[in-house]
Amino acid sequence: MRQILIAVAVAVTVSILLTPVLIRLFTKQGFGHQIREDGPPSHHTKRGTPSMGGVAILAGIWAGYLGAHLAGLAFDGEGIGASGLLVLGLATALGGVGFIDDLIKIRRSRNLGLNKTAKTVGQITSAVLFGVLVLQFRNAAGLTPGSADLSYVREIATVTLAPVLFVLFCVVIVSAWSNAVNFTDGLDGLAAGTMAMVTAAYVLITFWQYRNACVTAPGLGCYNVRDPLDLALIAAATAGACIGFLWWNAAPAKIFMGDTGSLALGGVIAGLSVTSRTEILAVVLGALFVAEITSVVLQILTFRTTGRRMFRMAPFHHHFELVGWAETTVIIRFWLLTAITCGLGVALFYGEWLAAVGA
């Protein structure tokens, strides 16, 4: 628990102190955000706001994670695990793709960065490497960071994927979550606040897995998860980094996370869901992200098949703006919905454990 608190504290500190430095630097360099011409009129005043704030988020996550492990050396904490490094590696790789995308947008002074093909190739490459590596690094108990079994709150032994299918499954998960968070990042503080709650829920889940790991506490309801405490530190550091960034990103935002941050954060969810064996449960925890990307898919499908749009604008947070909701109203209500779905997700997780132990 001490390591988790340290991870949060370090991540918040680094993120909240580094972000204003980036604001001044990016403002001086003219690294301003470009606004969609077809977006809500109220957003045009945001043109020129510094972007690429995801750099501070990634720095906070890395600092929180490494700081917690360094502190752990003083009180016999667990060392760095393969699971945590793989999740961080995935997030950093996707953040790199987003950074290039943001840089192109800034250099060309338009809201279009990497073309779809290049961006997709970057996401797929990151996902394939993750999918291959996550089935390696078997520990003394025979556990790998990931499992080829589909999982809800633990592995579903009756649904096992062949290695190639598992890698393809990882491509779908990584692409879906990174794009989902990217679509959600359209209002001041929406993605950062939502992500803080989702990863806070993951802190509870992975810490519970750590306390009830089959390796150290065998028995009914135990979890076969490699490095659960390591995953809790990743989740805690991510929550802390998002909170620190939110201090500057809350409406009216002084800086945006850009694709650097949104793609990286999507990678964190994807990585945590695979390594903690909660791929299906993650859909409940991150229901808002799922709803946002679903609204985009439905908008495209309905327009191509009927010539009409289901929403006034997608992602659907813009739809609510265009029907008269204030931006802050949309943000707060979406945060409330996320708090509910995260609470539901944790309740489902705990309920499954109670059922497993026969309580």
From Swiss-Prot:
Belongs to the glycosyltransferase 4 family. MraY subfamily. The keyword Cell cycle applies. HAMAP family: MraY. GO terms for cellular component: plasma membrane. InterPro entries: Glycosyl_transferase_4 (IPR000715), PNAcMuramoyl-5peptid_Trfase (IPR003524), PNAcMuramoyl-5peptid_Trfase_CS (IPR018480). Its cofactor is Mg(2+). Its main location: membrane. The keyword Cell wall biogenesis/degradation applies. GO terms for molecular function: metal ion binding; phospho-N-acetylmuramoyl-pentapeptide-transferase activity; phosphotransferase activity, for other substituted phosphate groups; UDP-N-acetylmuramoyl-L-alanyl-D-glutamyl-meso-2,6-diaminopimelyl-D-alanyl-D-alanine:undecaprenyl-phosphate transferase activity. PROSITE patterns: MRAY_1, MRAY_2. Its EC number is 2.7.8.13. Was identified as a high-confidence drug target. Catalyzes the initial step of the lipid cycle reactions in the biosynthesis of the cell wall peptidoglycan: transfers peptidoglycan precursor phospho-MurNAc-pentapeptide from UDP-MurNAc-pentapeptide onto the lipid carrier undecaprenyl phosphate, yielding undecaprenyl-pyrophosphoryl-MurNAc-pentapeptide, known as lipid I. CDD domains: GT_MraY. It comes from the Bacteria. The gene is mraY. Pathway: Cell wall biogenesis; peptidoglycan biosynthesis. It catalyses: UDP-N-acetyl-alpha-D-muramoyl-L-alanyl-gamma-D-glutamyl-meso-2,6-diaminopimeloyl-D-alanyl-D-alanine + di-trans,octa-cis-undecaprenyl phosphate = di-trans,octa-cis-undecaprenyl diphospho-N-acetyl-alpha-D-muramoyl-L-alanyl-D-glutamyl-meso-2,6-diaminopimeloyl-D-alanyl-D-alanine + UMP. Keywords: Cell cycle, Cell division, Cell membrane, Cell shape, Cell wall biogenesis/degradation, Magnesium, Membrane, Metal-binding, Peptidoglycan synthesis, Transferase, Transmembrane, Transmembrane helix. It is a multi-pass membrane protein. The chain crosses the membrane at residues 3-23, 55-75, 80-100, 117-137, 156-176, 187-207, 231-251, 255-275, 280-300, 334-354. This is Phospho-N-acetylmuramoyl-pentapeptide-transferase. It is found in: Cell membrane.
